[in-house]
Design a protein with these regions (language model features):
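A short glycine-rich, hydrophobically flanked beta-strand micro-motif that places a catalytic Asp/Glu
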Residues: 39-43, 158-164, 211-216, 282-292
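Glycine-rich anion/phosphate-binding loop at the beta-strand->alpha-helix junction
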Residues: 186-277
Length: 360
């Protein structure tokens, strides 16, 4: 099917689920910074009206200021509203020691769990991401810039959704644009200009006279963030990856140290696919990796592209270390302390992170 419309969505850093992701990853950052390669972190976060709960399992987690880290992250995101203010949060810390049974298989850098992970890349744009998810992210990044640059009636919680028309398998135009953004009371009629500015600045000629716009279609979005909807870590896994354009193995990234292959192997799969496309071996590439808990080598590797799949797979198998330790060492994942900053607007794309670097 070469002619079709495909839709993807993104959410802002103030979306409740993303607030949870950022808190979980801020604790991962702190644990890794204060620990070493024996540090293990698996932390989930729940946020709701004036309330944050963190729970999970850790090892060699030398962090004694958990509540301060949470408040600082919420303040950084920008929440100072009555129902969710960084200074008035009730915070419950239920973090405890990791099971010794898990450590038996992972202390020697076996995979931290079983699972399947996918990576994808395409030559549709410089970010090497499918256009619908790429532009969904870019719209919200631009909207945040505007919010911080004078449009102070805009508030942190926002969502976007972009429908791209493909003709002959190539990006043709934007068919539908949906943007919902939280705002201060009384400013519901002031949104159209900044939203359209944000969209037009990133999408350019893809917007035409036939593009349909939906800007705050419910009419009012004052109560937002965790005060409007409960947020949980790991509920935006499609936003985090490829917007549904490629499969997802089901495992979330945030709140997990690099021995968890849900995170590290997904980063590797993306890096592999991106380098295949960057080397002009294919216009698009999809990689699947699978692992078993405590086992170092992947249990399977699968390559799908419009190139020579067997040649690509053979090269990967013979030249790339796909063990958890090999992945961790290649990308320096135990010395990367910016997981919290990287978990918004997708984990992939035009980002200065090790798994987005070009070069074998």
């Amino acid at each position: 099917m070469n002619n079709y419309i495909f839709t993807s969505e993104s959410v802002s850093d103030g979306h409740p689920d993303k607030v949870s992701d950022q808190i979980s990853d801020a604790l991962v950052d702190a644990g890794l910074k204060n620990g070493d390669e024996t540090t293990r972190v698996a932390i989930e976060t729940l946020v709701t009206t004036n309330h944050v709960t963190v729970a999970g399992e850790v090892k060699n987690f030398n962090v004694d200021n958990v509540k301060d880290i949470i408040r600082d992250k919420v303040k950084e995101i920008g929440y100072e509203q009555e129902g969710f203010h960084w200074d008035n949060l009730n915070i419950y810390d239920e973090i405890h020691a990791q099971s010794g049974d898990i450590g038996l298989g992972t202390d020697d850098f076996g995979a931290g769990d079983q699972g399947i992970m996918f990576g994808y890349a395409t030559n549709e744009n410089d970010a090497m991401l499918p256009a619908p998810i790429h532009y969904s992210h870019e719209i919200l990044k631009k909207l945040k810039e505007l919010r911080l640059d004078g449009y102070d009636f805009l508030l942190p919680d926002a969502k976007s959704q972009v429908s791209i028309q493909y003709v002959g398998g190539r990006v043709k135009r934007a068919d539908q644009i949906v943007v919902s953004t939280q705002h201060k009371h009384g400013f519901e009629h002031s949104l159209r200009s900044p939203v359209k500015d944000a969209v037009n600045s990133v999408m350019g000629d893809l917007i035409d006279n036939e593009t349909t716009w939906h800007i705050n279609p419910t009419g009012n979005f004052v109560i937002g963030g965790p005060d409007g909807d409960t947020g949980l870590t790991g509920r935006k896994i499609i936003v985090d990856t490829y917007g549904g354009f490629a499969p997802h193995g089901g495992g979330a990234f945030s709140g997990k140290d690099p021995t968890k292959v849900d995170r590290s192997a997904a980063y590797m799969a993306r890096w592999l696919a991106k380098n295949v496309v960057a080397d002009n071996m294919a216009d698009w590439c999809q990689i699947q990796l699978s692992y078993a808990i405590g086992v170092k080598e992947p249990t399977s590797i699968y390559v799908d592209s419009n190139g020579h799949n067997r040649t690509i797979q053979k090269y990967i198998e013979e030249n790339i270390d796909l063990t958890p330790k090999g992945i961790i060492d290649r990308f320096g994942l135990f010395n990367f302390y910016n997981y919290s900053e990287n978990c918004v607007y997708g984990h992939f794309g035009d980002k200065d992170v090790p798994w987005e670097k070009i070069g074998w």
